[in-house]
């Protein structure tokens, strides 16, 4: 019997959230609604100049594992931190949420990663991320026993920045598939896709069963402005592709069908940070329970809807209870 339902492999990041206006984005020459990699100097500059932000343990796939745990699933996570205060905070947050996390921290070198997330009044988020210790994730960190004993291994596209990290993801995917398990990938960000498009396509063709992308990432991957065209191309490569479209919901494709998923909104949309992460959590949870792509997609819509109703990318409601309530009404 497998020990874990889901293993996430991704960046171990502490999010620092700020509510800002459009003028702040313009004045600081930030590229809105994407993730930009920054160096340690710029990260320290943000820390020293800005008022106290809301600090929450984050990281895209790490957020997904926390959401998965809240759904009553059994998740694990692999990611690199430093043995510093932020690293200890990150590790504790995962453990408290019910996520198994035992990756060895580094003692010397760059600090634990942090992401400055600037949320504008339209609820869009602009991220400036210092990768820090995440850059040292290596194939040695890929725990073969955990990978073999996880139903689905979920890889984070953001990690595809360092050569060692690339080797790590490929190694994990190969171990998982040889063990007869599924491998999922989130493309993470349009800029990330633009930068690594050909490498991502090769990875998807060789090692991925389930792909998550928003409509901009899917179009960038396939070099087309036609969403259906990009979905068809991706569907020919893999088993399942889920394409999220913000307030328009999502479309999910497999070899047999394409299903439309309506967006679920609880109250007002306050912060879209983590919407894709929690969509993935809900969908993958459904797949581990052998639900259809339609039912899994509806669960995903509910979990994403919860996360955008408040600040931060970690659920504030017991998702298992919420799903039970929403699906029985």
Give names to the regions the model predicted:
Residues 75, 101, 183-184, 241:
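Hydrophobic beta-strand scaffold residues
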């Amino acid at each position: 019997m497998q020990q874990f339902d889901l293993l996430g492999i991704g960046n171990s990041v502490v999010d620092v959230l700020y509510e800002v206006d459009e003028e702040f984005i313009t004045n600081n020459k930030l590229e809105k609604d994407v993730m930009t990699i920054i160096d340690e100097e710029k990260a320290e500059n943000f820390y020293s100049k800005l008022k106290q932000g809301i600090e929450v343990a984050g990281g895209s796939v790490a957020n997904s594992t926390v959401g998965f745990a809240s759904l009553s699933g059994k998740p694990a996570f692999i990611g690199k931190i430093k043995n510093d205060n932020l690293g200890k905070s990150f590790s504790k947050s995962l453990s408290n949420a019910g996520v198994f996390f035992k990756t060895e921290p580094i003692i010397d070198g760059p600090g634990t990663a942090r992401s400055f997330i600037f949320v504008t009044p339209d609820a869009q988020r602009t991220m400036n991320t210092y990768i820090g210790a995440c850059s040292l994730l290596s194939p040695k960190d890929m725990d073969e026993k955990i990978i073999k004993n996880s139903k689905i291994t979920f890889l984070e596209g953001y990690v595809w920045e360092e050569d060692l990290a690339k080797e790590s993801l490929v190694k994990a995917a190969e171990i998982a598939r040889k063990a007869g398990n599924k491998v999922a990938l989130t493309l993470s960000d349009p800029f990330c896709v633009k930068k690594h498009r050909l490498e991502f396509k090769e990875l998807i063709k060789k090692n991925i069963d389930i792909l998550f992308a928003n409509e901009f990432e899917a179009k960038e991957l396939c070099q087309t402005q036609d969403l259906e065209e990009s979905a068809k191309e991706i569907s020919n490569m893999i088993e399942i592709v889920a394409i999220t479209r913000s307030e328009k919901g999502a479309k999910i494709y497999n070899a047999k069908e394409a299903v439309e998923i309506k967006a679920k909104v609880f109250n007002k949309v306050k912060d879209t940070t983590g919407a894709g992460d929690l969509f993935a959590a809900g969908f993958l949870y459904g797949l581990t329970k052998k639900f259809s792509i339609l039912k899994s997609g509806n669960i995903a819509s509910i979990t994403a809807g919860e996360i955008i109703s408040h600040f931060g990318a970690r659920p504030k409601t017991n998702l298992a209870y919420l799903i039970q309530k929403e699906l029985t009404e």
